[in-house]
């Protein structure tokens, strides 16, 4: 089945180009659809309901095309993520069968929008044979995505979907609109009439995969009334039962003792701890012991020779300290010595007297 014209690097490059081209087209078509909705609101305000219905069919067709491009973008991304399988395996991997067949089926229908998609389909046919490509284009192989085939079909959208689009557009732009009662009466029971169906209603009701086909998110399966059952709460541990590790269940060891047990030593006893703490002497008891004679004291006393050699220290009594008496200041002048002149005895040097008086005070 290995084709002769397959080039792995060319397939890789064109897959990336297809992804970029699809993103640009999705953004462009979404913006154009938003502008077209304003035009439809103007038709409804002017009372041109039939004209508005025709324009809504164009918008639905563009929305379908955008959703189909999103599916193809996801498939191209999947092939790039698993490109190693494409290179290493000669046969087609079962996880890539839907992606490969869907890209080959969509290539002739979208090659006018995305030219690189045809190159991708040709490389896949060269890898897995032209016969496989023919089976994919006619969906005889049965692995083409059903949602993508529905989005790219040429059938007209259902009337109930057109009415829902008109109701939603009128509500967004505050335009009065009365939906067709005959069409609304044909709506299937159990489906909300004000919900816009963009192709995901059946998938959600069936609990199938989300946007992007296989590998998407799977919705939880609900009950017959559409409700989703609540999960069972986790069991909470009892507050009264303490946690403990289970004992190991292994062979006996260590002289027949099972694992996880402890045996005390038979000849070793723990020390006895007294019930009350020991008593200590108080300060009063210490002072009372000072009056006990030295004969009652147990133990060697100090040697008398050592105590005799100790110098006696005078008692420090600063309160009874008495200063020595100072001599009184003389009131009379000293007598003049013999041979001194009368003028000398009359001249008294008071500075000399003060100096000598200060010296006497210092000596005493």
UniProtKB/Swiss-Prot annotation:
GO terms for MF: cadherin binding; identical protein binding; MIT domain binding; protein domain specific binding; protein-containing complex binding
Gene Ontology biological process terms in this record: cell division; collateral sprouting; cytoskeleton-dependent cytokinesis; ESCRT III complex disassembly; establishment of protein localization; midbody abscission; multivesicular body assembly; positive regulation of collateral sprouting
PTM sites of type Phosphotyrosine: 43
Annotated protein name in UniProt: IST1 homolog
Keyword Cell cycle listed: yes
Pfam families (alphabetical): Ist1
Family label: Belongs to the IST1 family.
Region of interest (Interaction with VPS37B), residue spans: 64-279
Annotated motif MIT-interacting motif, positions: 351-361
Residue positions of motif Type-2 MIT-interacting motif: 321-332
Functional summary from the UniProt entry: ESCRT-III-like protein involved in cytokinesis, nuclear envelope reassembly and endosomal tubulation. Is required for efficient abscission during cytokinesis. Involved in recruiting VPS4A and/or VPS4B to the midbody of dividing cells. During late anaphase, involved in nuclear envelope reassembly and mitotic spindle disassembly together with the ESCRT-III complex: IST1 acts by mediating the recruitment of SPAST to the nuclear membrane, leading to microtubule severing. Recruited to the reforming nuclear envelope (NE) during anaphase by LEMD2.
Location of the region described as Disordered in the Swiss-Prot/TrEMBL record: 294-352
Organism listed in the record: Homo sapiens
Key words, A-Z: Cell cycle, Cell division, Cytoplasm, Cytoplasmic vesicle, Cytoskeleton, Nucleus, Phosphoprotein
Biased composition (Low complexity): 335-345
Effect of residue 353 to A: Diminishes interaction with VPS4A. Greatly diminishes interaction with VPS4A and abolishes interaction with VTA1. Greatly diminishes interaction with VPS4A
């Amino acid at each position: 089945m290995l084709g002769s014209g397959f080039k792995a690097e060319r397939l890789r490059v064109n897959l990336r180009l297809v992804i970029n081209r699809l993103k640009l087209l999705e953004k462009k078509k979404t913006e154009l659809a938003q502008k077209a909705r304003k035009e439809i609101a103007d038709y409804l305000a002017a009372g041109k309901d039939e004209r508005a219905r025709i324009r809504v069919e164009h918008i639905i067709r563009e929305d379908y095309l955008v959703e189909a491009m999103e599916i193809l973008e996801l498939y191209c991304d999947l092939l790039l993520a698993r490109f190693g399988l494409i290179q290493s395996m000669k046969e087609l991997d079962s996880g890539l069968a839907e992606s490969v067949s869907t890209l080959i089926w969509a290539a002739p229908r979208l090659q006018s929008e995305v030219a690189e998609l045809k190159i991708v389909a040709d490389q896949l046919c060269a890898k897995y044979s032209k016969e496989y490509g023919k089976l994919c284009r006619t969906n005889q192989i049965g692995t083409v995505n059903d949602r993508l085939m529905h989005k790219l079909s040429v059938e007209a959208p259902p009337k109930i979907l057109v009415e829902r689009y008109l109701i939603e557009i009128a509500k967004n732009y505050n335009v009065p609109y009365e939906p067709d009662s005959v069409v609304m009466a044909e709506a299937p029971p159990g489906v909300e009439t004000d919900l816009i169906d963009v192709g995901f209603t059946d998938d959600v009701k069936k609990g199938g995969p989300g946007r992007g086909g296989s590998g998407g998110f799977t919705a939880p399966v609900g009950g017959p009334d559409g409700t989703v059952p609540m999960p069972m709460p986790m069991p909470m541990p009892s507050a009264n039962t303490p946690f403990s590790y289970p004992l190991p269940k292994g062979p006996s060891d260590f002289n027949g003792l099972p694992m996880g047990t402890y045996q005390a030593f038979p000849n070793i006893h723990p020390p006895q701890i007294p019930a009350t703490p020991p008593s200590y002497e108080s300060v009063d008891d210490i002072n009372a012991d000072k009056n006990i004679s030295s004969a009652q004291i147990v133990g060697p006393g100090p040697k008398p020779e050592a105590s005799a050699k100790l110098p006696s220290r005078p008692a420090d009594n600063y309160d009874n300290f008495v200063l020595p008496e100072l001599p009184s200041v003389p009131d009379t002048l000293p007598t003049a010595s013999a041979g001194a002149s009368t003028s000398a005895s009359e001249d008294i040097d008071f500075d000399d007297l003060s100096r000598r008086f200060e010296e006497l005070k210092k000596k005493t």
